[in-house]
A protein has these predicted regions:
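N-terminal helix-turn-helix DNA-binding core of bacterial DNA-binding proteins
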Residues: 11-51, 73-82, 87
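Conserved segment of winged-helix/HTH DNA-binding domains
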Residues: 73-107
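Short, conserved clusters of charged catalytic residues that mark active-site
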Residues: 10-11, 66
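Long, low-complexity, charged/polar intrinsically disordered regions in eukaryotic proteins
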Residues: 1-9
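Beta-hairpin "wing" of winged helix-turn-helix
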Residues: 62-76
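Alpha-helical residues within the helix-turn-helix
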Residues: 43, 60-61
């Protein structure tokens, strides 16, 4: 299981912002149950395919999702299937106290 870590307040804020979006959480839940590609997720959640693709890329960049390209007999012939990466986030007062205030702070 991936334990997400952060060393600055801005890093933690970005992660919490990413996870604080209901649609991204719904996508994570969906791809934790079964691998899917952007169009399937968009139809399931009632959002646009471009928005689903943006959210999937954000989740993948954060390490919370993995995408794998596969070919299909039907259009689109090349699809990128996503699955959730098991992860945990631990945030408590001690963690917050240990964080640097900014990414430029040296101590």
């Amino acid at each position: 299981m991936l334990t997400l870590s952060f060393s600055t307040i801005p890093e933690l804020a970005r992660l919490l912002s990413l996870l604080g979006n209901e649609q991204r959480l719904a996508i994570l839940r969906s791809i934790a149950i079964d691998e899917k590609y952007a169009r399937e997720i968009a139809e399931e959640l009632g959002i646009s395919r471009p928005l689903a693709a943006i959210y999937l890329r954000q989740l993948e960049k954060a390490g919370l999702a993995e995408g794998t390209g596969r070919t299909s007999d039907e259009p689109p012939y090349l699809r990128r299937y996503y699955r959730a990466v098991p992860f945990e986030v631990v945030v408590d007062l001690n963690v917050i106290l240990s964080l640097e205030r900014s990414e430029d702070e040296t101590g």
